[in-house]
Curated annotation (Swiss-Prot):
Pfam families attached to this UniProt entry: Actin
Claim: Hydrolase is one of the keywords in the record: yes
Annotated function: Actins are highly conserved proteins that are involved in various types of cell motility and are ubiquitously expressed in all eukaryotic cells.
Name under which the protein is recorded: Actin, muscle
Top EC category: hydrolase
Keyword Iron-sulfur: no
EC numbers: 3.6.4.-
Reaction(s) catalysed (UniProt annotation): ATP + H2O = ADP + phosphate + H(+)
Gene source species: Chionoecetes opilio
Protein keywords: Allergen, ATP-binding, Cytoplasm, Cytoskeleton, Hydrolase, Nucleotide-binding
Major subcellular location class: cytoplasm
């Protein structure tokens, strides 16, 4: 919950409400879950959830945690499956590299530019840019960072900004409370 235009929600709580005599919302309702009963037929009481109309519908989500990194481009509210990138390189690998001092070359580095032959014989080259050039400006305008590995100092300003041409305006949303949210709920928050 929050106000339109805010970079992050002002409050995060489960979407559950219970009413024995008083109204309970969020975590308080969750804690009383065993003693709550719904005294209404759900099919007779519709619920309306709204999304602020001016929220961005285009951008890139970079989620990098302990074992895997995902980049997911979203355009006009739709995920672009052909451009999703999964990289089995994340925080655990960076920690191992820094503590052991190993040379850090991966197959992912060698595969940034690669040619593929299609069944019809046509050869295409796929580079690190997987989204149409016409939408890249829109994608760079809304980048959401998530996961513990994005907490490294300077990752937003230095690393993400370096990926865009200097003429493109970049907006990076990296809420400082993302670590506390993970510490509080852990991976269980995505497995509810």
């Amino acid at each position: 919950a929050g106000f339109a235009g805010d970079d992050a929600p002002r409050a995060v709580f489960p979407s559950i409400v219970g009413r024995p005599r008083d109204a309970y919302v969020g975590d308080e309702a969750q804690s009383k879950r065993g003693i709550l009963t719904l005294k209404i037929a759900p099919e007779e009481s519709p619920v309306l959830l709204t999304e602020a109309p001016l929220n961005p519908k285009t951008g890139i989500v970079l989620d990098t945690g302990d074992g895997v990194t995902h980049t997911v481009p979203i355009y006009e509210g739709y995920c672009l499956p052909h451009a999703i990138l999964r990289l089995d390189l994340a925080g655990r690998d960076l920690t191992a590299y820094l503590t052991k001092g190993y040379s850090f070359t991966t197959t992912a580095e060698r595969e940034i530019v690669r040619s593929y032959e299609l069944p019809d014989g046509q050869v295409i080259t796929i580079g690190n840019e997987r989204c149409d050039i016409d939408i890249r400006k829109d994608l760079f305008a809304n980048n959401v960072l998530s996961g513990g590995t994005t907490m490294y100092p300077g990752i937003a300003d230095r690393e993400i900004t370096a990926l865009a041409p200097p003429t493109i305006k970049i907006k990076i949303i990296a809420p400082p409370e993302r670590k506390e949210e993970y510490d509080e709920s852990g991976p269980g928050i995505v497995h509810r």
